[in-house]
């Protein structure tokens, strides 16, 4: 399918559960139609990068993406068309906070988007071994949604 198999936590489904969205850290977001397993890559609106997504959640016809692989690090709302097969607009929800040290993994509950502000990616060496002395306590953030 051409989708990065190494990032299994960066996917979400639409409300009808007929479309799966999978983020690839370098390529962007693939939309997979569940009925026929057809894969197509979403085109991003001008002004927003497709790269560096390390968290993805579907909510009210939008994808909320955590982008820790771009500068500035940010949380972006990517608005979908009604068919959920094209990105039509975007809005930066939060960015450039000094507390954002590799934000990752999010969920939406009770009208807020929750995510970790400090995933421990920098605590791993080149061989994938975790240096526990470099791991900070998790910091959970929330953004109130409309």
Regions inferred by a protein language model and the residue ranges of each:
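Beta-rich, blade/repeat-based domains predominating
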Residues: 1-19, 23, 47-67, 98-110
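Short, conserved, GDST-rich strand-edge loop motifs in beta-rich repeat architectures
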Residues: 118-137
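Surface-exposed loop/turn positions within WD40 beta-propeller blades
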Residues: 17, 26-28, 36, 70-72, ...
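A short beta-strand motif characteristic of beta-propeller blades
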Residues: 1-2, 38-46, 88-96
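Short loop/turn segments that connect beta-strands within beta-propeller blades
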Residues: 33-37, 79-84, 144-146
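Short loop/turn segments immediately following the C-termini of beta-strands
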Residues: 24-25, 68-70, 80, 118-120
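Structural signal for beta-propeller blades
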Residues: 28-30, 71-75, 122-123, 140
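Anionic-ligand binding region
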Residues: 29-31, 36-54
């Amino acid at each position: 399918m051409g989708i990065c198999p190494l990032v299994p936590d960066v996917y979400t489904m639409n409300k009808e559960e007929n479309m799966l969205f999978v983020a690839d850290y370098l390529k962007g977001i693939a939309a997979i139609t569940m009925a026929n397993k057809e894969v197509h890559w979403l085109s991003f609106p001008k002004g927003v990068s497709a790269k560096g997504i390390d968290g993805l959640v579907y909510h009210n016809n939008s994808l909320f993406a955590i982008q820790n692989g771009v500068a500035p690090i940010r949380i972006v709302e990517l608005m979908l068309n009604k068919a959920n097969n094209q990105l039509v607009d975007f809005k930066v929800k939060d960015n450039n906070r000094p507390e954002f040290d590799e934000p990752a993994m999010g969920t939406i509950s009770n009208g807020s988007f929750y995510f970790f502000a400090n995933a421990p990616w920098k605590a791993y060496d080149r061989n994938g071994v975790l240096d526990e002395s470099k791991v900070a306590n998790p910091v959970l953030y929330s953004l109130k949604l409309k």
